[in-house]
Amino acid sequence: MVLVGQGMEPEEAFTKVQVVYYLSRGGQLQQPHLIDVPVSTHSNGLYLRDVKRRLTSIRGKGMGDSFSWSCKRNYKNNFIWQDLADDDKILPLSDGELVLKGSELYTGFQEKAEFMDGQFDPENASQLPNKIKKLASKKFDFEAVKRSLDMESDKLQEQSDLAAALSLSLQLMSDPHMKRFSKDKSMDLNQQVMNSLSQAKSNAAEECMLDHSVTDISSETLHSEESTVQKFSFNETIRERSKSTASASSSGTDREHSYGPPRKTESMGRERSLPRDLPRSREVSRELPPQVPREAPREKSREMSRELPREAPRELQLPREAPRELPREVPRETSRELPREAPREISRELPREGPREVAREQPREVVVPREVVREVSRELPRDVSRDSSKAVKDTAKTRQEKPEELPTIKTKKSPTCSESGDSTPFMLSPRRLMAALSSPSPEKKFGKLVHSSSTRSSTPSTSAASTQCEDSLPNINIRLAKQATCLSNFRLCGNANPHATDSRPDSPEHPLAAAAQPASGAVPQSPNTRGHQGGPYWPRWRSGRKPRTSSEGKEGPEPPTPPRGPMTKPVTVAKPDPPLKKSFEFDMNVSGVNSAMATPFLQTENNSPSSSESSSAAVSSGKKPASISLSGTSDASDGGNGASSTASSSSEVQNNVSVKEVITQQLPSPSSSEGRPSLNIDTASLPRVSISEAISDVRETVKTTRPDSPESPMKPNPPSSPVRTQLSSSPSFNKRIEDARARARSLVSKEIRSGESRSSKDLLKENDRVKTSSGSMRSGSTRTPNNKNGTTGAGSKTLSGTFNRSPPRINSIMWEDAPLTPTKKEFVNRDDRPLTAGRTNLDWEKTLQEAASLSLPPPDFGQILQECGQCGRTFKPDSLKVHMRGCHALRRSKDFQPFNGTSVAIRTRLQ
C-alpha cells in the first residue's frame, strides 16, 4: 500500500493526507489505491497505525493485520522499501509523496500451505490470526474423496480379479494332467475359484481407504488364493500320476489312465478354443503311443490326436536300435570313385518297410562330408554321372526326361595315345570355348582346357598314358581352335557374302568343310533351330535363287534365321583335319574384333607341322601372309541407281563389323611393285575390310573387279555392282598436304610479324581454303551426285572415309580432307562485350569506354541514347524497342527531352 501525501495544510483539529498504497499477492503488485488519512494537527507526522485504522474502517476487519507494510524512501540516488511497525513514522519522498506497499504475511501463507498438506498442528492454532483459526476449525470433506476413490478402486479390482481368474483357469485347463479329472472334480475346482474371487472382492470393498490400501490388500488376498489353488492342483496332479503309474505297472490293459479316448467332459470343449502360446508342461511320459485300430472312424482318430500330448511323439516315433547299414565316414579314396548318383542309389536300395524309420535314420547313418561331394563333382566328368544314371534307370521310373547333353568335341586318337587304350571324349562347353577364344592368350586357354579335360577323363590306370598324350597338345589346340571358330560362327550368326564362293563353309574348298562332316556321313540336325535346313553349325544358303541387285530388282540370297535355342547335338570329328589356314570365318560384334584379329596370328605361331608348312609355303610362293577380313553392313542405299553410302564417322563404322572372308591372294599396290600390305575397303552392300599384319600406309584407289581376272576369287559382279576401293598413300599426295601446311605456317608467321590483330578463326578459314583447293587439284574427277551424305570425309589417322557407290567408269583417285566445323556469324550481346574491371554495363558508360579505347571524341548522347517514356530509363534505339515490350511502369515520366553532352557531364560530376 503506497500512501502519497500532498499539501499538508495545517488545520485546527485534523488534516487529511493522501496516501497511495500497493497490495502484493503471490509476488505480483496489484493496481495502486489512493485513500485520505486524517491526521491531527498536534502530531509530528503520519504513523502506520493511523493508516491501518483507516483501512479497517474502509476495507473491513483484518485488512491491516493480514499484510506487512513498508514505505518507499530515497537511498543513494535510488529508492528502497523500508519495513514499518505500528508505531513507526512514514517518511515522505523528495517530492513529498507518501507511498506504502502491503505484502502478504509469510506466517499466514506458510500455515495455510501446511494445513493443505495435512501437517497442520492444532497446538499452534492460538498463534495464528483469527481468520486462519476459523479456516482451521472447519472439517475437511473426507466422504466425497472416499466415494471417488471407492469407485476407482472397484473398477481396478474388477479388472484385476477377472484377469487373475481367467489366467488361473487357463493354466489349470492347459495342464495335460488336469484332463484326467472327472466332471465332479472340475466343478469343485471352478466353485472354489469363484468363492475365492467373491471373498477377495468383498474384503476389498470393506477395507477400501483413502491411502489406497484396499488395492494392496486385495492383491495380497488374490495372490494367496492363487497360491492355494495352485498347490491344490499340483497335489491333485501328483496323486493322479501315482495312480496312473501304479495301474500301468499292475496291468498293461488298464485303459482308465492311459492315453486312449477319454469321455467327453465340459473342459474338453473349452480346451479346443485355447490359444497355443500358453505355457504347457514340458514333462513327457514314457508310455507307449496308443494303438489306433484301422476300423476306427475319422472322428475318433481326430479326437485321439487332439487329446495326445504334442511332445510325446517326438521321442516315441522311431526306435533307437535301428541297424546301421553304412558307416558314417566314407574314406576319400572310395569317395572319389563313387559316381554322383551314389546317394540316390543307396536310398533306392533301402527297404520300403517302415518309411518313417528309414527317413528318420537315413541322415544319421549316411553322412557324406561336403568336401567329398565337392571333390567327386570336380574330379568326375559328366559322362560318368550319366552312365551311372543309366544303370539305375530301372529303379528310377519317375525320371522320364534326361538332362540336355552339351556339345562334345571328340578328337581322333593320336599315335602316342593309341597304345594306352580308348581315348575319352573331351567335354568342352561352348561357353568355355568362347571364353577361351575371346581371351588375350587363346593358346594358353585352349591348352588348359585340353589338359583339364584329359585329366578328368583319365583314370588311375591310364595316368601313364595321359603323360604320353601331352606331346600332342599343339595339334589338339589347333583342332580345338578350328572347332571353336565353327561354334562361334553358329552361335554368333551373321550374313555371309554370296559372292565369296570359296569361303562358304558348305563348299568343298572351305578349310573347315572336312572337319564339319561327321564320321557316319549323316548330318545331325539341331531341334531348336527355326527355319534352318542344315546340320552343321553354320548357315547353308538356299539354292535356286540368283543374287539380287539394285538395278535388276531380283531376289538375292536371304540369310537364314540364326538358331535361338542352345546347341543340343554334339559335333563329332572322326576324320583327320586338313592343314590349318591362317584365318577363319567369324561373326561377332565390334567388341570382339580385337580378339578375332589376334586369334589367327596366335594360331600361326603354333608349333604344329601343318601351320609351319602353310606359312613356309606362303613365303616360298612370294605371297604375303593371310589377313583377316572385316565387313560392315551399309544401311543407306538409293533406289533405282543402286548407289549406297556407308557411315563416315568411326562410331557409325563400328555398328556391325564381322569377319567375313578369307583373302589369301596378294593385292597389287600402285605405289610399289613388291605389293606392300594395305587396307582394302569394298563399297558393296556388305563392304569387306582386309587388315594385314602390318599396315604401313593408307592409300585410296578405285579399281574394277573383272570376272576374268586371275587375282580375284570372287564371282563376276553385275554391271551395277559396287567396286572395290583400295586406300593408299602416294608421295605426291603427301607432298601436297605438307605444302598446304607449310603455307598455313607461313601465313601465321607473317601475321605475327606484321602485328595485325587477326583472329585465329580467320587463319583457320585460310588454311581450310588452301586445303580444299589442293584437294580439288588432286581429285581429278567429279564426285558422284547420288551421294546422300553430302561432303563427308576422313583423315589418314582415323582410317575412315566416305565410301561412295560410284558407277564402274570411275578409275581415278578420290580423297578429301575432313572439313572444319562451319563458321557461324559472330553475334556478341551488348552485355557480353569486354569491359574494364570495375565498370558497369550501362549503355552510356559502354559508349564512353568504347570512345576512350578507340581515342574518339565524346559522342552526342542525345543522338545515341533515348529515354523510355514510361520508366524514364535511357537505352540505345535497338535496346529501347526490346525494353518497350516488357516495360510495365506504373507512373509515366515527363515527355522525352534529349539531353546533350554538357548536361551529361554535369550529371556525372554530381554523381
Swiss-Prot record:
GO terms for molecular function: protein homodimerization activity; zinc ion binding. Homodimer. Forms long polymer filaments with other SOKs proteins polymers crucial for polar localization and biological activity. It comes from the Eukaryota. Zn(2+) binds at residues 868, 871, 883, 887. Keywords: Cell cycle, Cell division, Cell membrane, Developmental protein, Membrane, Metal-binding, Zinc, Zinc-finger. Residues 219-470, 492-810 are annotated as: Disordered. The gene is SOK. It is a peripheral membrane protein. A zinc finger (C2HC/C3H-type) spans 864-893. SOSEKI proteins locally interpret global polarity cues and can influence cell division orientation to coordinate cell polarization relative to body axes. 'Soseki' means cornerstone in Japanese. It is found in: Cell membrane. Residues 414-423, 591-607, 663-683, 722-733, 785-805 have a biased composition (Polar residues). GO terms for cellular component: apical plasma membrane. This is Protein SOSEKI. It comes from Marchantia polymorpha. A motif (Association to cell membranes) lies at residues 493-494. Its cofactor is Zn(2+). Residues 15-107 are annotated as: DIX-like oligomerization domain. Belongs to the SOSEKI family. Residues 253-286, 295-407, 696-709, 735-771 have a biased composition (Basic and acidic residues).
